[in-house]
């Protein structure tokens, strides 16, 4: 199977002490490269003649596949357990008291484990062992040394690429910032699922879909998903562009945001979302329109929805421009447009 890029699950501009620049670089460059590498490894394996291939070649590719799979999964878990305010839930506090003696004892061990990787590399995981029915803090080296029959519920990336942009060699400050941004609701949900005690969220199921006009930077991906807006993934968009002479791809980043950046998707045109009444008349109603913003949270969704109301076959890009770059999509200098 081909591994696909997930949209960045956090609002990278809203973290406490972890910069948007660092988080986006981590997502686009490190996570994105790993996804593409995994797909390349699998292509090599698919083309390999196993009847004649040397054992060392098979062994090397399978090891590389294992490490790449681990890196992809751990990166996705890492990003997804950020975005909170660091306030621990009562359920997780009770779990730490049961398994470590107290929240403070767990915190001391977890942070000491993280500090032990200063100047090195690896992951720090809080994992639930189904075999032991117990929580453990552990180190995972080379993206693959995880406990057997265990589920990571909290993931901290201690590779230098995760923090050097903001913190240089000061890994301790990075660890402190990470702890301030943990989404303990996410961690608790993972633990409940690992233990088999997760209950279906009736509140989430019953939550009414909000109006598109209410979309703002405060929305998370689950709230946007409940709107059921027409969308497209980076892989699907790449296929659409490849089969058309000229695809209608719009960069809908707001003017104040667009002016701060020097690049954009190759082949796209920028249009100010505040002036949709003017430029929407230039679009061809017989061709689909693909709209992206920076991260796929609200601007691109709103513009695509407004175009649909005007009779266009419009879709927003899930994950926005950042997911396109993570997938290795072509870019160009915005001043050329």
Where are the language model's segments positioned?
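Rhodanese-like catalytic fold shared by cysteine-dependent sulfurtransferases
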Residues: 199-247, 255-290, 295-337
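Residue-level detector of functional hotspots within protein domains
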Residues: 51, 58, 63, 68, ...
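Short glycine-rich, polar/acidic loop-and-turn segments at beta strand-coil junctions
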Residues: 78, 83, 253-254, 295
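Feature for soluble, non-membrane regions of globular proteins
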Residues: 1-210
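Active-site flanking residues adjacent to catalytic metal/cofactor-binding acidic residues
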Residues: 159, 250-252
């Amino acid at each position: 199977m081909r591994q696909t890029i997930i949209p960045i699950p956090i609002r990278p501009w809203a973290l406490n002490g972890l910069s948007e620049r660092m988080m986006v670089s981590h997502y686009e460059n490190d996570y994105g490269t790993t996804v593409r590498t995994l797909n390349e490894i699998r292509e090599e394996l698919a083309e390999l003649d196993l009847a004649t291939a040397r054992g060392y070649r098979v062994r090397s590719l399978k090891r590389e596949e294992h490490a790449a799979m681990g890196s992809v999964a751990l990166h996705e878990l890492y990003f997804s357990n950020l975005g909170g305010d660091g306030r621990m839930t009562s359920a997780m506090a009770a779990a730490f008291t049961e398994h470590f003696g107290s929240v403070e004892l767990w915190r001391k061990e977890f942070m000491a484990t993280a500090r032990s990787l200063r100047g090195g590399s690896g992951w720090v995981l809080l994992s639930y062992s189904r075999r032991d029915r117990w929580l453990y803090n552990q180190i995972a080296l080379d993206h693959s040394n995880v406990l057997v029959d265990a589920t990571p519920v909290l993931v901290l990336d201690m590779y230098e690429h995760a923090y050097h942009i903001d913190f240089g060699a000061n890994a301790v400050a990075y660890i402190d910032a990470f702890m301030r941004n943990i989404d303990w609701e996410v961690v608790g949900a993972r633990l409940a699922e690992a233990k088999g005690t997760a209950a279906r969220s009736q509140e989430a199921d019953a939550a009414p879909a909000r109006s598109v006009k209410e979309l703002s930077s405060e929305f998370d991906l689950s709230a946007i998903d409940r709107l059921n807006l027409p969308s497209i993934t980076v892989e699907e968009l790449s296929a659409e562009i490849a089969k058309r002479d000229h695809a209608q791809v719009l960069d809908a980043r707001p003017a104040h945001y667009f002016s701060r950046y020097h690049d954009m998707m190759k082949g796209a045109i920028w249009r100010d979302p505040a002036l949709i009444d003017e430029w929407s008349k230039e679009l061809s109603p017989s061709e689909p329109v693909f709209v992206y913003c920076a991260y796929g949270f609200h601007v691109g969704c709103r513009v695509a929805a407004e175009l649909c109301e005007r009779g266009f076959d419009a879709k927003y890009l899930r994950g926005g421009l950042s997911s396109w770059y993570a997938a290795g999509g072509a870019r160009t200098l915005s001043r050329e447009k």
